[in-house]
Amino acid sequence: MPVMRLFPCFLQLLAGLALPAVPPQQWALSAGNGSSEVEVVPFQEVWGRSYCRALERLVDVVSEYPSEVEHMFSPSCVSLLRCTGCCGDENLHCVPVETANVTMQLLKIRSGDRPSYVELTFSQHVRCECRHSPGRQSPDMPGDFRADAPSFLPPRRSLPMLFRMEWGCALTGSQSAVWPSSPVPEEIPRMHPGRNGKKQQRKPLREKMKPERCGDAVPRR
């Protein structure tokens, strides 16, 4: 009976000897794959991949041909080159400056009729650039600013304009201040509740402005 107990062990030994030997190079490769180190993509490569350029994008056929919405196409979307990506300035947008037409053959399916092949022309973006969007530039105030917006609103992320709204002056490179050209209301009383619950009259806006906090005030004529 001891022979019967050793027989399964003998079979396992034979199976282990029949397996191919693993070279030490594969051991090192397996150990390297199991490490926790992650490759870091350098900044230049990240910037190049994310910058404004024409990339392949899937576009719905119906979005390019709205009049064909009652029909079905196969495939329902096509691969086109479209401008996408980031710009170095938040006021700039990735827009196409050169386009080209491409004609594709699709299967058009009509209700009640047999499917038929049709040729549709699509526009592809060839060259892209970062430019200002039309209708968002203002000759008086730089930055991301709409032309139809009120003139007293500061542009986004414009620190000098925030100083102008708060203190009545705008900081410049020479640390001087310039009074705003828009008229400042002086005789418009506004009532607001005081600490004791009674309404109190606010001081004129010009009295709150302290140009000495921004430097030597230079009145604008």
Swiss-Prot record:
Sugar-bearing residue positions: N33, N101
Compositional bias per record (Basic residues), positions renumbered to this chain: 192-203
Keywords: Angiogenesis, Developmental protein, Differentiation, Disulfide bond, Glycoprotein, Growth factor, Heparin-binding, Mitogen, Secreted, Signal
SMART domains: PDGF
GO MF annotation list: chemoattractant activity; growth factor activity; heparin binding; vascular endothelial growth factor receptor binding
SS bond list: C52-C94, C83-C128, C87-C130
Gene Ontology cellular-component terms listed: extracellular region; extracellular space; membrane
PTM annotation: N-glycosylated.
Region of interest (Disordered), ranges: 175-221
Expression sites by tissue: While the three isoforms are present in most placental tissues, PlGF-2 is specific to early (8 week) placenta and only PlGF-1 is found in the colon and mammary carcinomas.
Signal sequence annotation: 1-18
Tagged with keyword Secreted: yes
GO biological process annotation, one example: induction of positive chemotaxis
Quaternary structure and partners: Antiparallel homodimer; disulfide-linked. Also found as heterodimer with VEGFA/VEGF. Isoform PlGF-3 is found both as homodimer and as monomer.
Its biological purpose: Growth factor active in angiogenesis and endothelial cell growth, stimulating their proliferation and migration. It binds to the receptor FLT1/VEGFR-1. Isoform PlGF-2 binds NRP1/neuropilin-1 and NRP2/neuropilin-2 in a heparin-dependent manner. Also promotes cell tumor growth.
Similarity comment: family membership: Belongs to the PDGF/VEGF growth factor family.
Protein name: Placenta growth factor
